[in-house]
Design a protein with these regions (language model features):
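Hydrophobic, aromatic-enriched alpha-helical segments typical of multi-pass transmembrane helices
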Residues: 1-165
């Protein structure tokens, strides 16, 4: 039996939530662009609406990439890679440590303790950045390590039609 199935689904749910936040933010920006080209309405009302849409964009990007990424991509995926042994321990620990740091930095921005993209949030995000870079670069250059979880299950069973080729 594979390990940590609930965490795997939690990771997928976190990535979906992040994507939804980003999509809503992008729709808000597109709505601002549409309002800018709409000449038939009152400029004052359009300005207020554009400011509201810009605030929605700011909040969605603070919640999605600024908060949820630390939980999903950092903490959950880092822990899964640490437990499975697919990535080196040091690299996986960057996700386990960097994820909560990014989440805490995101909480600080949400509660207006410091500015979004400011020095505090930028420094707190560095371990997560290194983790995400290593998650792409390490397997590309050296490949994933063989996992003891997969090794216990043996070789995959192939359908007879595949074997006949």
């Amino acid at each position: 039996k594979r390990q940590h199935e609930i965490l795997t689904f939690s990771y997928v749910a976190a990535r979906i939530m992040e994507s939804v936040f980003i999509a809503v933010g992008i729709l808000a920006v597109l709505a601002i662009v549409t309002l800018r080209h709409d000449a038939g309405a009152d400029a004052a009302s359009l300005g207020g609406l554009a400011e509201s849409l810009a605030a929605i964009k700011d909040w969605t990007f603070n919640l999605g990439p600024g908060f949820v990424v630390g939980i999903g991509n950092g903490l959950i995926l880092g822990y899964l890679m640490l437990r499975s042994g697919l990535m080196p321990r040091g690299l996986a620990l960057l996700g386990v440590i960097g994820g909560p740091l990014q989440t805490l930095a995101g909480i600080g921005v949400l509660f207006d303790l410091y500015d979004a993209g400011g020095p505090v949030q930028s420094i707190a995000t560095i371990p997560e950045i290194i983790w995400e870079l290593s998650l792409g670069i390490y397997p590309l250059i050296w490949g994933f390590r063989s996992s003891p979880i997969v090794a216990e299950e043996g070789r995959p069973v192939l359908h007879p039609a595949v074997l006949a080729r």
